[in-house]
């Protein structure tokens, strides 16, 4: 199959666009419309074509369609037209997918993409160089172009791991121009997602977040073509003395959440440490527009509140499983048993990777260790958590999360003949217990083939990496961070 390659002219265009982006960061946001359009050229997206994925082991994640040991998926104009054992069409591209699993792309429901290039500065064996001190100190020195470069690097990793939707948990929005840069990066990379606008690192917890800037961003960016949605990420809430970035008062919560709700925007919140759920319930603040993150210390009463209010919970298995015992345990079993909506997320990639296969594996192993068969958990249920349930969490299950006619074509192909996968038995079991990101062969988002045969089809990854590396070096210098 012919793969799209960047010409020298395209690469020069991308370099010019980056310079335009840097200049644009110095302009008022209202003057950046032309600059934003030019910056999009730095990551040209492949066109949407009509094609049929042929002969794959299809896992639709739709109970009305089911699975096919050998099946086809027809895509046209970015949408799924049909899913069936055999689809015959003439004059369309055929993607041969024998010895591959065809499934919905993973939906990541919580990722601090702005920290992606800080990886060389973080360490797990040195508390002074852990995620919190590094991101807090360097976060204060971010420019819009740093935000752009970091988000693009993170989304490149997301695509390589089979994530087609990412919730960008942006808790370092230093200005509307920074938010604009992150949204541009999400759009330019062609990944579906939500951008949650948050307070800047280092902002005093008595100071309200920039609701006027949030409204400005909403006016500029929403509605769009359905690829991106908008929300807010709240700072920590309650009286916890362990929150490393402190907490905000309930009065400020009412002000900020009320401002978001006036704009009809969803809200997301970390709940590390003592749970604020009862506090929020007593204040009348919980609802189906709220997503919580890190279910580690909830009570049975709180889980019933979450179910009744329609609140969802995002689990970040890799990071959460490495926390000290006093921080709690991943309460997947308790959440499922209570009927709370649950999804999976990466959290950050400073000290680990985007790897949904590992996330599912950790959840299964911890579940078996804690509760065994008392609360059944199947491999298929875990794959559902990583795909359809993530779309439910983000409120976009009408367009993604499963393979069904009318939905947008967010699809991945996973090779089953690779040495770590073959010979394959049950496909769900293989995905959860055996698969790795390197097995992801093809990634399709909204009908655009962004990766094929394990390679980007159009993105100049070397450029993305170079810009992110330069950003990290510049941030370290501006912050006076030791090498």
Positions of predicted regions on the chain:
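Metal-coordinating catalytic core of metallo-dependent amide/deamination hydrolases
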Residues: 42, 177-304
């Amino acid at each position: 199959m012919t793969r799209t390659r960047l010409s020298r002219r395209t690469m020069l265009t991308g370099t010019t666009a980056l310079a335009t982006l840097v200049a644009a960061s110095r302009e008022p946001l209202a003057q950046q419309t032309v600059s934003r359009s030019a910056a999009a050229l730095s990551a040209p997206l492949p066109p949407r074509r009509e094609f049929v994925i042929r002969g794959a082991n299809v896992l639709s994640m739709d109970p009305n369609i089911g699975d096919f040991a050998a099946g086809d998926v027809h895509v046209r104009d970015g949408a799924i037209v049909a899913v069936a054992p055999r689809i015959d069409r003439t004059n369309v591209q055929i993607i041969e997918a024998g010895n591959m699993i065809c499934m919905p792309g993973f939906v990541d429901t919580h990722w601090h993409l702005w920290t992606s290039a800080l990886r060389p500065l973080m360490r797990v064996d040195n508390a002074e160089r852990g995620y919190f001190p590094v991101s807090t100190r360097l976060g204060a020195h971010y420019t819009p172009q740093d935000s752009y470069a970091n988000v693009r690097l993170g989304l490149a990793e997301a695509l390589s791991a089979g994530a087609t939707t990412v919730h960008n948990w942006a808790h370092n929005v230093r200005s509307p121009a920074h938010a604009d840069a992150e949204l541009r990066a999400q759009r330019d990379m062609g990944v579906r997602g939500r951008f949650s606008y948050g307070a800047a690192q280092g902002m005093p917890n008595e100071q309200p977040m920039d609701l006027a800037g949030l409204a400005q961003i909403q006016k500029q960016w929403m509605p769009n073509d359905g690829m991106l949605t908008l929300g807010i990420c709240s700072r920590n809430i309650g009286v916890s003395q362990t929150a490393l970035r402190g907490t905000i008062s309930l009065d400020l919560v009412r002000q900020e959440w009320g401002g978001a709700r006036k704009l009809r925007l969803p809200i997301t919140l970390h709940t590390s440490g003592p749970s604020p759920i009862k506090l929020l319930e007593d204040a009348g603040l919980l609802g189906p527009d709220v997503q919580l993150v890190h279910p580690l210390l909830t009570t049975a009463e709180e889980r019933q509140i979450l179910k009744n209010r329609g609140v969802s919970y995002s689990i970040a298995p890799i990071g959460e499983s490495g926390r000290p015992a006093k921080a709690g345990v991943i309460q997947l079993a308790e959440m499922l048993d209570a009927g709370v909506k649950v999804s999976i997320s990466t959290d950050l990639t400073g000290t680990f990777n985007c790897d949904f296969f590992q996330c599912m594996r950790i959840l299964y192993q911890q579940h078996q260790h804690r509760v065994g068969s008392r609360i059944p958990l199947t491999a298929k249920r875990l794959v559902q958590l990583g795909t359809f349930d993530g779309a439910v969490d983000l409120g976009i299950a009408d367009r993604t999360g499963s393979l069904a006619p009318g939905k947008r074509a967010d699809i991945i192909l996973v090779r089953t003949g690779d040495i770590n996968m073959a010979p394959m038995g049950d496909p769900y079991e293989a995905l959860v217990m055996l698969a790795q990101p390197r097995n992801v062969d093809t990634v399709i988002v909204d009908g655009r083939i962004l990766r094929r045969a394990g390679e980007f089809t159009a993105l100049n990854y070397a450029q993305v990496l170079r810009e992110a590396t330069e950003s990290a070096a510049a941030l370290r210098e501006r912050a006076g961070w030791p090498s």
